[in-house]
Amino acid sequence: GATNLVTGIATANYDSVPLVCFTGQVPTSLIGNDAFQEVDIVGITRSISKYAVTVRKREDLAETIRKAFYIAKTGKPGVVVVDLPKDIQRAYGSDFYPKEITIRGYKPNTSVHMGQLNKALDILRHAKKPVFLIGGGVNIAHANKEMTRLAELTGIPVITTIMGKGAIPTTHSLYVGNIGIHGSYAANRAISNCDVLFSIGTRFNDRITGKIEEFATAAKIIHIDIDAASISRNIVVDVPIVADAKKAICFLLEKAEPLSISEWVNAINHWKKEYPIDMGRSGLTPQMVI
């Protein structure tokens, strides 16, 4: 049964979905003996989850479960696998679920690097053709209202990944569309022609970038993400910023100014009008669903 979770675990983890999976295991005394239906699920899922652990002592159960939910929800959300041997499941105890938890070596970043954000603002002030590229990190941080206000304050058009859709209303005049192979002509052309690409909460996977060497070649790239490992992994950026999306956006709201980019916005609106996504006249299409 545990192996049936593998695809779901990988998908949820790649999409930064907080998920705790409890799996059954043979008794601790039989682990490593090739017992009936014994599978090293921790080993199988370690590379596709945020954390995976086998509980080998009843005394560790309550604390491990508390840690599992804490790790899954904090920092960059992800999947935690808790493997429970049969004897641990059947054990009795009176342990209390700890209210506070400290995990050595795990300290999610929640600060805002003001120096890097000021550098990003300086680049924005001189931009003629800027765009925001918004990923799921903004939705995870519940920063939708703040993101909409930032777009309206600066006047910068907003492009989203599929996971970032909803970061601002899709009916908003500054919303361009989705990027990448599932995206619109206007969004992809805007990325190709922008001079500043301000990305928040994305990981620049291949569904977005296509050929990396041809992605936003004329742009200075600013990237905000809570996960340092996601920055400059696929696309080398000019201004890396490790920060919580909502805190960073709130800082930008205090410092940002309206930009004089009406010619650029008009060009994007022209592309949206000339090359709309054709939904067809009957039935559902993939474009309509997305």
What is each model feature region?
Residues 24, 57, 84, 135-136, ...:
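Cofactor-binding loop segments of dinucleotide-utilizing enzymes, especially the Rossmann-like FAD-
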Residues 59, 95, 122, 218-290:
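Phosphate/pyrophosphate-binding active-site segments
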